[in-house]
Curated annotation (Swiss-Prot):
It is found in: Cytoplasm, Cytosol. Transmembrane segments: none annotated. This is 5-oxoprolinase. GO terms for biological process: glutathione metabolic process. Keywords: ATP-binding, Cytoplasm, Hydrolase, Nucleotide-binding. It comes from the Eukaryota. Signal peptide: none annotated. GO terms for molecular function: 5-oxoprolinase (ATP-hydrolyzing) activity; ATP binding. Catalyzes the cleavage of 5-oxo-L-proline to form L-glutamate coupled to the hydrolysis of ATP to ADP and inorganic phosphate. Belongs to the oxoprolinase family. The gene is oplah. Its main location: cytoplasm.
Amino acid sequence: MTIDKLKKSIKFNIDRGGTFTDIYAEFPYEPYYIVEKLLSVDPENYSDAPREGIRRILERIQGKSISKENVDTYAIKSIRMGTTVGTNALLERKGEKVLLVTSKGFRDLLQIGNQSRPKIFELNITKPELIYNSVVELDERVQIVTNDQVLNDIKLESPNSLKKGTTGDYIKVLEIPNRDKIKSELLKYFVKGIKSIAVVFIHSYTFHDHELLVGEIAKEIGFEHISLSHQLMPMIKAVPRGLTSCVDAYLTPLIELYIKNFTKGFDSNIGDVDISFMMSDGGLCPVDSFRGFRSILSGPAGGVVGYSKTTSTVIESHKNNNGNNEIKQQPIIGFDMGGTSTDVSRYNGTLDHVFETEISGLTIQAPQLDIHTVAAGGGSRLFFKSGLFLVGPESVGAHPGPVCYKKNGQLAITDANLLLGRLLPEYFPPIFGPNQNEPLDLEATKKAFKELTDEINQFQQNNNLPLMTEDQVAFGFIRVANEAMCRPIRNITEAKGFDCSQHVLACFGGAGGQHSCSIAQNLGMPKVFIHRFSGILSAYGLGLADLVIDTQEPCSLIYNKENKSTFEKQLNQLKENAKQQLLNKGFPEEEIFCEGFLNLRFSGTDTAMMIKTPDNHDYEAEFKSNYKREFGFLILGRDLLIDDIRVRVHARGSDLNSLRINDSTGEPLKPETIQKCYFESVGRIDTPIYLLKSLCGGDSIDGPAIIIDNTTTIVVEPNCKANILKPSGNIEILIGGGKSKTVTTELDPIMLSVFSHRFMSIAEQMGKIIIRTSISTNIKERLDFSCALFSPDGGLVANAPAIPIHVGSMQNAVKYQVETLGSNWKEGEVVLSNHPQAGGSHLPDLTVMTPVYHKGEIVFFVASRGHHADIGGITPGSMPPFSKSISEEGAAIMSLKIVKDGHFQEEAVRKTFEKSRNLSDNISDLKAQIAANHKGIQLMQELINHYGLDVVHAYMYHIQKNAELAVRDMLYDISISNNLKPLDTLISTDYMDDGSKIELKLTIDREKKSAIFDWSGSGVEVYGNTNAPTSITLSATIYSLRAMVKSEIPLNQGCLAPILTVIPPGSILNPSFDSAVVGGNVLTSQRLTDVILSAFGACANSQGCMNNLTFGDETLGYYETIAGGTGAGPNFNGFTAVQSHMTNTRITDVEIMEKRYPVIVKEFSVRYGSGGDGKFKGGDGVVREIQFLKNFTVSILSERRSLQPRGLMGGENAERGLNLVLKNNGKYINIGSKNSINIERNESIIIFTPGGGGFGQKDSMITDN
């Protein structure tokens, strides 16, 4: 080959993953492409995998040896790379040291986050560690002014302090940071070796001056990397924007170092090579523009671009609106199954983006592809616990890996596929074993499955159930894994109003081909598409990607004719600026195209939709069309607001060469070999094995069959048919109905796990509907709601992760309506209730219940409970601290049909809530709850139609029985581990701040594996509002039991089956009909939980309350609960600044709160030292100070202000809480635990929340017992 032909001819597309680096290189001469795969880390053989891969390919093409450390770039035209370098550094916490600079009072804001805990039943709360090393608080603050009254006050008193932010909002500068102070503070940390800085000030998304000042000084000092939050993503919400700036400061220096080390191994002409990197949004950027916060999805993004541009399946031509025939591509679900997890995404002509995602405990604001991840992959571990097949979320990793890797690993999905004959060891390279020179070990996998099957069969035998073979066990885990992977697919289709069955499944990634047919069958999809390079599609997709500039600015305009010229001018200016950047890089104008977007939402809601500029420029019509499709209704009478203006400018990527393979000769195909494989419908049968490289365009293969390539194994299930497409050689699998094993009503542990996933998936999708369709901050942002499924008698079946106080007591509400209404509950009717005597908790928690009908009979119930911000009562927020009867707490409803014959009964609802201070929000949120229930009904009916009512009912009861078994085993284990007598009684006592006694007499019967919870020693009903209805006690009980069960089981009615509960009437835990109860739900419930967990020795006391703060007047009401410390336990510390036990609501972001309400949050920080000391230390509480800019009624409803949260086993007590008011004259007043006061303008409330108790004497030895 001539030297001229080689010059600038080779395009390299590289996916550097955590384990392997895949390279697809292409050039305009035979053989036109080369694929290379190598380990991402192999320091004994090379220092950088992508560069080594390039070197190897160049050697093969040029036929000569090339130096490893001075690679010749003569033949290289371009290098495109997607990398997990940033992602892995974030997951492993191996980034740069970072200094965080923020506004005074908010040093711990990013640590507290939204104050929720990730797993509601985890007593030993864990979150990933912080990524900044030190914090500087500066005397800096601005106030956003959106309230007319407050604006007029400022104009009268200090008009010169007002400025305009970039959004158009007025800003009052409260304090300008001092230049000398900034410099001295930054120097302290610079001299300690911190060279990367992240800056986030409150409201800097619209007012940039103070961040720019800090950035300027940091640059003067010599900081090497400076991340200013407003320059990265100027969107409202201080926490995610601040975390984004920290992520950028943490990762960008690492990425820059990686790029430097990568390029230094080439010759001096590397600067002439076009090098670009894949960003999280699916667009490429030049190497010098690649930033840490845009790198998180750099790896998987290439695969999404790859399938979006190569999946060529179409539906039949049809008539469009103009009466013409058109061919339309089917929407596609991307299915990328790897070793530890599976990523799913959706494509329907455009890439779907989201602008706020969470990874490794950090919320990141940036345009990212809407990729949903589930912890199920080839390396997911297999467990059998309490009669349940469980897959993951733990992974065996690459080392030691599955059992078959011969490194003393554990059973994983890969082992199951190997045992079933779906993976063939002879087609894997010999890279396993301790010396990485052995093949996959089938015999080791067989032995491990034999041991697991023996364990499972012991359970089967004990429960008079049929014994299982190793094949059945292995396939059972495959089926459970498939169901787990279906859940996120349902969430991105059905939960958003799309029909799953109308999509094509595009499968890629190393493990996906073994599961794709089953996944498609489960979801009713007609086809699977597998690209010829599916195993390296993330690399291949890089060659199809565009260079992209994506930029946006915040906005606060109403979408109307008056503002049209303003936002269109801003949009056009953004387009021109971005376009000019690409022109400056040498792209011709004809290759550049621009997209404009408005981020729109209804006034008073948080659900914004990014609307691409329609052809007719009618953004409003497009927004409403999308909104109605996704949510099923429109909100009338509300302004449309513009939150952000965005542009996305592309420079079209050069297309890769079209792949071509030979056409089929039409002769019968001869398999490479025959392998015994197991399939559910036919058992273990002879299965033909084909090599993809031997197949031609037009070949067809009937299942069962296996197709093998260098990078993937594809299982074609029975009744499916694989077609090799012309001329590309891509694979299309037509999915047949298949013959699944008939599911009977008899307990099958495999189907038990499958139904557990299905029931929980339905509840999850109900929750997604309620988030998207609700109006109020309480429900939409703080997530103070729950959704669940119930049996025909009202027993809890399954719920989505939610608020424990709701879920445990909702079944009492459903049961009450079942008993009260009976046959008077008709189809098309929806019932509302909130009364504590009807299974309610406290009155603001409104429960909406709907029956699921099948052939004219009620067969299930679905219900949703949401906390409404105001329903009347004597104080705004309907949480009066001093209520003496329920009539003072708001509208009390035993049973009200709010939907009859399918029609919302608005007049009746308005009359019921006539004293609400925000009736429109009540109505909107009730409609959201109705919509969530409707979704639940649809999905339940689909499940019944698929399996039959008898089977679905049977597994409903099996799942409840499974939970019962898990609790019984837990009671038995605790009896043994705590050295109790076979029948033994424990007593746990605590007191409310008013002295009311809460006493549990706990009797555990080891032989029966049961317990009696006797509350007879508790105090009498109080003349106040800390009375707790019986549903609250049952809720605290079911939560505590579930929290002490170590395995993953669904929370349901079965948890209470082993428990006899004794609650005498007339007590604080079983009050009279008219007693006040608002505090019982939010305060006494926490004390009940502390008493139960103390009796079991599970952990010390948490902060013991929810710190309920409300404020408002006759025009508005606001409510929040505030985090504190959790109790330590055996071998774990308590957690700081988090919600505990019976609640898990989020806190409203400070910028959202201040924009909507006339307040200033002065401080939100950790209350250091408030946790109890001990062998294991209790978590610390928080300090929260809010200044009011109008006269308001402010109410606090709290506990643990008199009595400290207790330590356990010699651990010390935590600090009690404190509520203060700071008057305008500078005087502080202690307002006690429960009070309602009229606060004057500019006065503040300061809340110090309690910590959690310590566990064990400080110098003692604590064992697991």
